[in-house]
C-alpha cells in the first residue's frame, strides 16, 4: 500500500487540529493522525525547541504508518525555524505523494478561534502574539507550494477541499 502525507501547518488557534480530526473521522481507519501537540505536550511534556524529543518519535510514527494506511495526517505549528529537519524528513519520505496545507489566517482570526476552544484558558492572547509567525511557508520561493487555507473557509469547505485534493492525486495513479 502506498501512503500519502497530508501536512497541515499554521499558527496556534488556526484550526489545524479541528480539520485534521474531521478528515480522520471521514477516512476512519484508513487515516492515522500524528499531532504535534499530543507528542510534544502530552507524551513528552517538552518545550517547543529544535530537535526536541517529540520530533524523533513523530518521525518513527510516520515511518511506522507509511505503507500501512493510505493517509498519514501530520498537523501542528511546525515552524520552519524549529522543525526544518522534521519537515525536510517528511518531504524526502514522500517525494510525490503529499499534500501540504498552510492555514493563512490573520492574528485576529486565530485569537477569535482560540476563544472557542476548550484550551482557551491555557494561554493568553499575549502569549499567542509571542508565538505568532506571519506566513511561515515551507516553500516560499519554489514552484511546489502549500495550498492555502483562508480565513473565510468553513470547516466543511476545508475538509471537502482536502478530500477532493486527496482523491485527485489518488485518481492520477
What are these regions (language model features)?
Residues 14:
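ATP-binding Walker
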Residues 21-67:
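Conserved substrate/cofactor phosphate-moiety recognition/catalytic segment
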Amino acid at each position: 500500500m502506498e501512503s500519502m502525507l497530508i501536512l497541515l501547518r499554521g499558527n496556534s488557534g488556526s484550526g489545524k487540529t479541528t480539520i485534521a480530526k474531521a478528515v480522520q473521522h471521514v477516512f476512519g481507519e484508513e487515516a492515522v493522525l500524528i499531532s504535534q501537540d499530543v507528542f510534544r505536550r502530552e507524551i513528552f511534556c517538552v518545550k517547543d525547541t529544535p530537535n526536541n524529543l517529540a520530533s524523533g518519535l513523530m518521525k518513527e510514527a510516520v515511518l511506522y504508518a507509511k505503507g500501512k494506511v493510505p493517509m498519514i495526517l501530520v498537523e501542528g505549528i511546525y515552524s520552519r525555524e524549529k522543525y526544518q529537519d522534521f519537515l525536510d524528513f517528511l518531504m524526502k519520505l514522500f517525494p510525490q505523494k503529499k499534500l501540504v496545507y498552510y492555514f493563512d489566517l490573520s492574528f485576529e482570526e486565530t485569537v477569535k478561534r482560540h476563544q472557542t476552544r476548550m484550551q482557551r484558558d491555557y494561554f493568553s492572547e499575549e502569549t499567542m502574539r509571542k508565538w505568532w509567525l506571519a506566513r511561515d511557508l515551507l516553500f516560499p520561493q519554489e514552484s511546489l507550494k502549500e495550498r492555502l487555507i483562508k480565513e473565510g473557509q468553513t470547516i466543511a469547505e476545508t475538509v471537502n477541499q482536502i478530500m477532493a485534493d486527496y482523491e485527485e492525486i489518488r485518481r492520477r495513479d
